[in-house]
A protein has these predicted regions:
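Short, Lys/Arg-enriched N-terminal segments with co-localized hydrophobic residues
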Residues: 1-8
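N-terminal amphipathic alpha-helix/helix-capping segment at the start of soluble metabolic enzymes
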Residues: 10-57
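Alpha/beta enzyme core
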Residues: 53-199
Length: 199
């Protein structure tokens, strides 16, 4: 009866009061669930986390109250809570020690690097959790740019794309489910896709 009533309302007088009274469809939780346009639950979420090297380390993120960076060992416990809540995916953002940064950000593709070790640890501890990795050079460069720069400080697009491709491949080899480029280099999506397909 309810469904046919709604269909009749929509064909007889679309958008005209008093025939259309949306309050009718909002009066009980069950009716609201039937007509809801968008539903959002824990299974729709991706949990962003900041990981740092070391053991039993945490650091508060001053600009984001209540958010902290964690070492891998502590992060695994936090992710266990996320899994228990029904959150299906995690997005990793590394905090790289200064001594591992360089002009070209080559540490990003280290198979034993922070992100790569984190991906492996997560997949071992929580195999059903989807792992998304950030493909970007800014955490790894001494200058903080998201690309390899020349002597004049100009970002070299193609050289950067080559490094980002190496990074994405190393993440995939470590077990990442999704590699997510966040840089702004021209052509990097195609280059990464081609390299992943060829691997």
């Amino acid at each position: 009866i309810f469904l046919s009533f709604r269909l009749a309302m929509s064909t007889e007088a679309p958008g005209q009061f008093p025939r259309i009274r949306m309050r009718r469809t909002r009066r009980t939780p069950a009716l609201r669930r039937l007509v809801v346009e968008t539903g959002l639950s824990a299974s729709d979420l991706i949990y962003p986390v900041f990981v740092l090297d070391g053991d039993k380390r945490t650091e508060q993120v001053a600009s984001m109250p209540g958010v902290e960076r964690q070492s891998i060992d502590l992060l695994l416990g936090t992710l266990g809570e996320a899994v228990d809540l029904g959150i299906p995916a995690v997005a990793l953002f590394p905090v790289i020690d200064a001594d591992k940064k360089s002009l070209d950000g080559a540490e990003c593709a280290n198979p034993d690097g922070l992100v790569q070790r984190t991906v492996k640890a997560i997949k071992e501890a929580h195999p059903d959790l989807a792992v998304i990795t950030d493909v970007a050079l800014d955490p790894y460069t001494t200058h903080g740019q998201d690309g390899i720069i020349d002597d004049a400080g100009y970002v070299m697009n193609d050289e950067t794309v080559a490094m980002l491709t190496r990074q994405a491949l190393s993440h995939a080899e470590a077990g990442a489910d999704v590699v997510a480029p966040s840089d702004m280099m021209d052509g990097r999506i195609g280059a990464i896709r081609n390299a992943l397909e060829a691997a």
